Amino acid sequence: MLPWVRTSWWVSKLLRESVSREGRLLKMKTNWTKIFAVMLASATLSFAVLAQAPDNGTQKPAAATPSADQILDKYVAAIGGEAAWHKLNSRIAKGTIEIPAMSLSGTVESHEKAPNSMLVVVNLGGAAFQRGCDGTTAWSDDPQNGLRTETGAEADDSKRQSDFYHQVNMRKYYSKWNLTGTEKIGDHDAYAVEATSTAGDMDKLYFDTQTGLLVRAITTVHTPQGAMVIQSDLSDYRDTDGIKLPFTVHQSSAQSDYTLKFTEVKHNVQFADSQFAKPATEPAAQPAAH
């Protein structure tokens, strides 16, 4: 899952709980991350725009339908290629989150460090949410559940999404790729690829037939409340330090929808490993002195 889909995947998990805003308790069972990745990027699942050949007015022969493996290869090339990605070892991204149905807006910030550390912080409606993984332990901290360690399928999800090079390591996380046809996604003709994860989930990825960009991803996320299917739509791709990233991710599920817009991205930032570790719990209350 690509960066923003990974991030939005984590955001959606954070926002499934309730937050207090202006004296009201809002139940927020929203989607994602991950995004690809976004966020997951996850998304997250973001793909670079390939340069378009100029139209010289001549009729071009119809291109042969590529295989699923060729589509994946085009994706890796489109986002800059493995060499460009491995020149980067960390990332900080800042942006905004909007939930129109609840008239809520806030900020989101993600920190990522190779090989597999990630931290997402969301401030929304006066409440703060955090989700982190140090490569070994995945954890979250939110107003409803407090600080907790993730377990089972939820923890496995978080650890997979924390791979900094997930987008060029996708063959590591998907055991099977199957091209099912071509579909229209907005203004894009897209190849629809069913991808079976090593965890057994079936994701559906839509790649622009011309650019190789991922324009939509339908993925399964595991939470303490059960599995959740999320649709991520990616747009506004920009060049960033030799790679391309989508700066807008819109996510929707059966519960709600929201939009992440990233405004600032920096690579090769220095992070201490301790920043991604689960915070120490508050000390137990001491008995009163007699």
Descriptions of predicted regions:
Residues A37-A48:
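Bacterial N-terminal signal peptides
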Residues W9-K27:
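Short, Lys/Arg-enriched N-terminal segments with co-localized hydrophobic residues
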Residues L45, A51-P66, Y75, T281-H290:
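Compositionally biased, proline/threonine/alanine/serine-rich low-complexity intrinsically disordered stretches
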Residues A127, D189-A280:
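Gly/Pro-enriched, hydrophobic low-complexity segments
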Residues W139-H166:
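Acidic/charged, solvent-exposed loop-and-adjacent secondary-structure segments enriched in E/D, K/R, S/T
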Residues V19, K27-M39:
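Bacterial N-terminal signal peptides that target proteins for export
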Residues A63, Q70-G146, Y173-G181:
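N-terminal mature ectodomain segment of secretory-pathway/periplasmic proteins
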Residues W4, W9-W10, W32:
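Tryptophan (W) side chains
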